[in-house]
Amino acid sequence: MFNIIRSLKFTQTFRYSRLQRSFGTNMIPQFCKQYYKKTGHKVAVILAANGGEPISAFLPSESKKYKDNENKHLYECMTTKYKAAIKYLDKKGYKIGRKLYVCAQGCQDVAIKTPTSKYIEMFTEVHSSLKKDLGITKGAIVETAYISGFLGFSSSDYSYPYFKRVQNIHKAQESLIKNNNDIILGSSFIYDRYIPDQSNYESNKFKTKIYLNSKGKKLPYDKALARARYVVCYPTKNSIHMTSSALCQIGNEVAVNLAKSF
């Protein structure tokens, strides 16, 4: 999850932050370029990501639903960095326009079987807290999925396959977008390119608009899976993280959709 505000980009390190640092391979550079192109407004980004976290870990620490075994206090890290950014920009004389956030989160909730209703409830609390504490006016969701072709880690997973878990989180994210006028679809790139295990792929339950032949029929599973792996770092045995080109496309889509939403 990262937050965005209009203004110049800057870099600053904050004490006790447990958030990840940027390694440059992410959606942010293309987002900034495209958002500026579409709106004429410069952008400052506060990166507030931490991989492998369920939505419960991003809740304010005083929330009864907050759950983080390592007590990283991610919400407080996010808001501390954000407020410091505002202070820095104010001091430099920049006029701050829209305050927005972009959220690319959900894979871990797929893994731990977070129910649709609980995800909606917790995401809404994070969203409302960011609005209240930081004055953010709108958020964009990057819809997520899980490892393409993955059925489960063991036979105990097969009764509740990852395909069903992905659908549960997708329904939650779609519901949040549909039922809140201040939450939009940033990008469905990741979800659109996800495919489940072969059995679920070949069933009528799975629909795709990506893995189709010239007649509009589903591709054979092996061909579809090979295509799905083009957008992740599969050659390096990384089947869940997007390639840099895929992340650029996601950043581009989020910027276009946010710009159109005003």
Predicted regions and their residues:
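Cell-envelope and extracellular/periplasmic
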Residues: 1-262
